Amino acid sequence: MRHNKAGRRLGRTTSHRIAMFRNMVTSFLEHERITTTDAKAKELRSIAEKMITLGKRGDLHAQRQAASYIRDKKVVTKLFSTIAPRYKERDGGYTRIIKLGIRPGDNAPLSVIELVEEQVNKKEKKAKPAKAAIVATAPAVEQAAVLTSPADEPVVAEENAPQSAVKDAVDECEGKAD
């Protein structure tokens, strides 16, 4: 039984799965974005984030650990020189998974996994005009409550009329409708 066993097997032997993820991490760090299935992307995320954390450490031992997993020396250099410094202020969460839909051939759910880019440029907020200026420029509109009876006879209630007069007018209209 497979109780308490973490990770996805993805229908592959252990050696095949390890080789596949080594290739995927190398491609991901080289291109900074790849398209794959949802399950592979979710599993790749943890491995890639561990590699970026090694890159942030930056010592010789971390470089050797990364080189033992990543297949291309140029990608290891890129990890330590360009990718890791980009995330020096960020504690985890270096990747993003965006779902794309399904693959037409086998109906597999596809995703794009990419490195998160920092948003440096923020839009400046425009100053809003004061509300008092807006109210002063608006034309004055007379307030009159118009009540319609079922017989389509409009009953206009005056602005300063007492509530009892309004109720009488409504009752009068309802009496005519019956």
Swiss-Prot record:
Residues 168-178 have a biased composition (Basic and acidic residues). One of its GO terms (molecular function) is structural constituent of ribosome. InterPro entries: Ribosomal_bL17, Ribosomal_bL17_CS, Ribosomal_bL17_sf. Pfam families: Ribosomal_L17. GO terms for biological process: translation. The keyword Ribonucleoprotein applies. Keywords: Ribonucleoprotein, Ribosomal protein. Residues 150-178 are annotated as: Disordered. GO terms for cellular component: cytosolic large ribosomal subunit. Part of the 50S ribosomal subunit. Contacts protein L32. HAMAP family: Ribosomal_bL17. This is Large ribosomal subunit protein bL17. The lineage of its organism: Bacteria, Pseudomonadati, Thermodesulfobacteriota, Desulfuromonadia, Geobacterales.
